[in-house]
Amino acid sequence: MNKRRNLLNISDLTVDDVENITKLANQYLKKEVANSHILENKTVINLFFEDSTRTLASFEIAAKSLGANVVTLPIRSSSINKGEDLKDMIKTLNAMNPDYIIIRHKSSGIINTLAKYVNCSLINAGDGSSEHPTQALADYLVISNHKKQIKDLKVVICGDILHSRVARSNIRLLKMFGAEINLVAPPTLICKHFPEVDSVHYSLIEGIKDADVIMLLRLQKERMNNSSSEKEYFYLYGLDSQKLSYAKPDAIVMHPGPINRGIEISSDVADCVILQQVEFGLAIRKAVLHYYRPC
């Protein structure tokens, strides 16, 4: 069991933490965990202020399968809509003595602020364009199951880098293990403030040459003021089988979802390891709840 309470950012993790969590996740995938009800009599509260299918469902399934009592608060009918401050809402929920609060919110960095007001384990399920640590852990697990080692792998992250919490968490996590990180995006969607990044490209074909791993990102129009046409974007940055031929023959294509077929990826390359990312995401969230369980 980890002595630290919260998983807010990749910087909260050590190499040992990542290896222990992924080891647990592999055990859950293989159904090798001895105590499947390790969270019996524990309470998990899910607070999702942004839409979610994969992350919310997998946290719910993970917690219930481990024996926890799960409360997913419907935000649209919560006291937030009566004008309650988020800080006061968190303090109120904390007073009910849950064991975990899992939060997704549109504001970057807000979860780090809220951590000051809770006594339980706080897990970041995505905060604005800041971080999404459990998605990065799931992606790390997928890559580790397909490649012998992360060190020196050429990983290309392509798409809306500017608004992507998945990109930020993956860059930080994969760099911990020595991956070579390359970004591909239009100039308006790139973020150059990553000291961990090895190269930045504005051409997809140039960027994915000899790539081992290609991670595609959704255009996050909900976080944009304006954007290029979808047809133009796909022509320049959408991945299809012809563009994929520039990568290594055994390259894996990843996408955190939801997929927009015909925008960032064509149907002929969409069904690779993307569903495995979902499957492994569930195992990772079981492992995270297990690893951060209260005494």
Curated annotation (Swiss-Prot):
Function according to Swiss-Prot or TrEMBL: Catalyzes the condensation of carbamoyl phosphate and aspartate to form carbamoyl aspartate and inorganic phosphate, the committed step in the de novo pyrimidine nucleotide biosynthesis pathway.
Positions contributing to carbamoyl phosphate binding: 54-55, 104, 132, 135, 257-258
Example of a GO biological process term: 'de novo' UMP biosynthetic process
UniProt keyword list: Pyrimidine biosynthesis, Transferase
Binding-site list for L-aspartate: 82, 165, 218
Recorded GO CC terms: cytosol
Species of provenance: Wolbachia sp. subsp. Drosophila simulans (strain wRi)
Keyword set includes Transferase: yes
Family the UniProt entry places it in: Belongs to the aspartate/ornithine carbamoyltransferase superfamily. ATCase family.
Superkingdom per UniProt: Bacteria
Pfam families: OTCace, OTCace_N
Source organism phylogeny: Bacteria, Pseudomonadati, Pseudomonadota, Alphaproteobacteria, Rickettsiales
HAMAP family named in the record: Asp_carb_tr
InterPro entries: Asp/Orn_carbamoyltranf_P-bd, Asp/Orn_carbamoylTrfase, Asp/Orn_carbamoylTrfase_sf, Asp_carbamoyltransf, Asp_carbamoyltransf_Asp/Orn-bd
Pathway terms, separated by semicolons: Pyrimidine metabolism; UMP biosynthesis via de novo pathway; (S)-dihydroorotate from bicarbonate: step 2/3
Protein name according to UniProt: Aspartate carbamoyltransferase catalytic subunit
GO MF annotation list: amino acid binding; aspartate carbamoyltransferase activity
Stored SUPFAM superfamilies: Aspartate/ornithine carbamoyltransferase (SSF53671)
